[in-house]
């Protein structure tokens, strides 16, 4: 059986404590993963050890780190890399990730390209996050930008990342840390330990110092140690998981997105909204509907809510379970069928509350909960709610789910506040007043105006926070031409 070790500052370590991850379909043991306990994590993350790892990265010029990112992207895509005592080819990686998560091969490969694209375009990504700052300033600690002296200092000695299992694409968010001279402390998702391990191996093959990578498969207590022992971190999880860290400036939270599509009243004329049905369906269902940037709500004037819901439901109903090897597969099964059953039961319970109808069932003709080739799926589900207060109007689940919510004229005039806090809003409108309100609002983290799917991400822009600003702070800085001579003259 495959065994995945811990990485203790780049050094593989096999623990006596292991967890066996099962194949999502056969339920047979597939991989053993060494587990890091809290004591081991605390010892490895003593301040002096974190500082030594950061010094190893800090010595490498920024331009060389950018070159390493490009080389690592190629290795991640194409190389056979170490995997414990064995090796892992690119095809092995796709098969293994699919085996434990259920993600279809086509979706795995698409996410791999997304991660590699960020690594390959690292200079452009960082230029966007820093508003064009020349990051060679990190080599010396100070420099000049637009005629002004600048100096930045690290807020931490390492970036801790507590990761999910829902999609490999999420790893695009933390890989820029290496180019920013920041070591990584990674706690992988329980069903998806593959991608962070492979990325670390790709960087090490490209010449990155091994001590810059710590990899700690662990339980919830171990995840807490990673968050507490690193001065800055990212935490991916659901509301119940991330809620305890809300308000802690050290921890950048990545929870549910409650992403929405807003259809302006101007698009209702002559049924112009119909041209965007495929965009709405793709926003809901792409990548298996498992990302925080997938739409979970479509908000539209009450006069057109049922027509919009019916059209989008008809499109979603064509998405069916397929074999993992089928290039047309877009739905991922649930590794644990009980999770799918619980989610489906929650939706059925919500439908018992008056004011909601499941629109996809009529078009599909089969239940939401489905079995196919020994796997359990939740088929895409669209619910039409009578108003925003219905229990299903603002929910997010781990499959393609969305609610169509009717908007009164009074609520449309106050948009986006009636929708609440939203990670992404795609506004299908040419109404400048509506666009202006969206631009001024603090309720929207990512704003698309026009026919842009909610899941179309530009990685050179912030996503639930700005990684550079999370890791570095600017200080005031002045220096004479010859500090030593100036000090002597003053004496």
Name each model feature, range by range.
Residues 2, 303, 432-433:
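Alpha-helix/helix-capping structural signal
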Residues 23-36, 62-77, 188, 205-210, ...:
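Conserved C-terminal structural/oligomerization subdomain of aldehyde/semialdehyde dehydrogenase
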Residues 41, 67, 103, 247-248, ...:
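Catalytic cores of nucleotide-enabled group-transfer and carboxylate-activating enzymes in metabolic
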Residues 71, 202-208, 230-232, 238-387, ...:
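ALDH superfamily catalytic-core signature
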Residues 217-227, 333-342, 459:
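Short, conserved secondary-structure transition motifs
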């Amino acid at each position: 059986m495959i065994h995945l070790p811990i990485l203790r500052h780049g050094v593989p370590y096999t623990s006596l404590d292991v967890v066996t991850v099962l194949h999502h379909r056969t339920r047979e043991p597939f991989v053993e993963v060494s587990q890091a306990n809290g004591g081991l994590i605390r010892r490895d993350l003593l301040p002096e050890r974190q500082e030594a790892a950061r010094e190893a990265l800090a010595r490498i010029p920024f331009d060389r780190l950018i070159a390493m990112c490009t080389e690592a992207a190629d290795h991640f895509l194409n190389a056979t890399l170490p995997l414990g005592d064995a090796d892992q080819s690119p095809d092995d990686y796709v098969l293994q990730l699919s085996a434990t998560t259920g993600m279809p091969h086509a979706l795995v490969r698409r996410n791999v390209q997304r991660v590699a694209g960020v690594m390959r375009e690292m200079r452009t990504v960082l230029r966007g996050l820093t508003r064009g700052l020349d990051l060679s300033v990190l080599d010396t600690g100070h420099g000049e930008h637009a005629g002004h002296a600048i100096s930045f200092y690290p807020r931490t000695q390492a970036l801790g990342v507590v990761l999910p299992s829902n999609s490999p694409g999420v790893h695009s968010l933390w890989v820029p840390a290496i180019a920013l001279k920041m070591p990584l402390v990674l706690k992988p998702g329980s069903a998806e330990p593959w991608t962070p391990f492979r990325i670390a191996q790709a960087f090490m093959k490209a010449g990155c110092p091994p001590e810059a990578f710590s990899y700690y498969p662990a339980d919830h207590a171990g995840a807490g140690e990673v968050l507490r022992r690193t001065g800055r971190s990212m935490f991916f999880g659901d509301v119940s998981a991330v809620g305890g860290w809300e308000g802690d400036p050290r921890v950048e939270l990545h929870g549910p997105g409650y992403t929405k599509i807003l259809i302006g009243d101007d698009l209702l004329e002559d049924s112009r909204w119909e041209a965007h049905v495929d965009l709405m369906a793709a926003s809901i269902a792409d990548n298996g509907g498992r990302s925080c940037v997938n739409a979970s709500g479509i908000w539209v004037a009450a006069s057109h809510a049922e027509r919009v819901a019916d059209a989008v439901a008809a499109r979603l109903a064509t998405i069916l379970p397929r074999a993992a090897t089928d290039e047309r597969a877009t739905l991922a099964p649930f590794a644990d069928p009980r999770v799918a059953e619980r989610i489906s039961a929650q939706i059925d319970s919500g439908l018992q509350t008056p004011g909601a109808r499941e629109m996809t069932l009529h078009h599909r003709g089969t239940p939401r909960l489905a079995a196919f080739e020994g796997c359990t799926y939740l088929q895409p589900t669209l619910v039409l709610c009578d108003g925003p207060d219905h229990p299903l109007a603002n929910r997010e689940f781990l499959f393609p789910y969305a609610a169509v919510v009717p908007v009164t004229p009074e609520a449309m005039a106050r948009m986006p506040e009636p929708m609440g806090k939203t990670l992404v809003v795609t506004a299908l409108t040419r109404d400048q007043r509506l666009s202006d309100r969206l631009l001024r609002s603090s309720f929207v983290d990512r704003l698309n105006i026009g026919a842009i799917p909610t899941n179309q991400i530009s990685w050179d822009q912030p996503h639930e926070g700005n990684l550079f600003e999370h890791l570095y702070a600017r200080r005031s800085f002045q220096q004479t031409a010859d500090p030593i001579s100036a000090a002597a003259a003053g004496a």
